[in-house]
């Protein structure tokens, strides 16, 4: 197969998976590992991680590392086959929060979950196994399976993260379209006692209020920081209008 044909085939395979392809997927199309290595050496492909390549059509983004890691866990399966798995591997916890754009946690690892059992030797990848989550709690974010916003918050609460971080997550989650307070409260209910609340609803109310208070205080501090600048700007403007010879303001 000629170089142009190889690249065209790879682009077809990766068209629905962010311009990323694995050696296993390429092998199913008759493309050998050595061919991929040579294309990478020529600069036609970029290595994302072991056995995972970025194609020329790939557009870099903040979720590339998570996507590449997810694909590498089942390297011979195409993305549509992954979605059909009875026990799919989905992005969860801190990584899911990053994907959803909620909270301010910095994920120490790439975190995923599955209802079954799954192991990986990849460094920096953690998989929670034997999970039990309803189908509606797995959502697609640009084709990537991710735990829902509500379940993501609930998972992190069960991980006993600091209260302030959880408050940020709750506040951001409530701003997301389609996130219902009742769903969020239900997911937080198992952790309510740990955070000294009697119910999930009470915990949602308390954390939402705390986050709003912090936001208001931050906004007030930012406004106060502007006061000296405003005063200095006005003083400078006044000085420009002063005529020292005539001793008058113009």
Predicted regions and their residues:
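Short gly/ser-rich loop at a beta-strand->alpha-helix junction or flexible surface loop bordering the NTP-binding
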Residues: 2-148, 155, 159-250
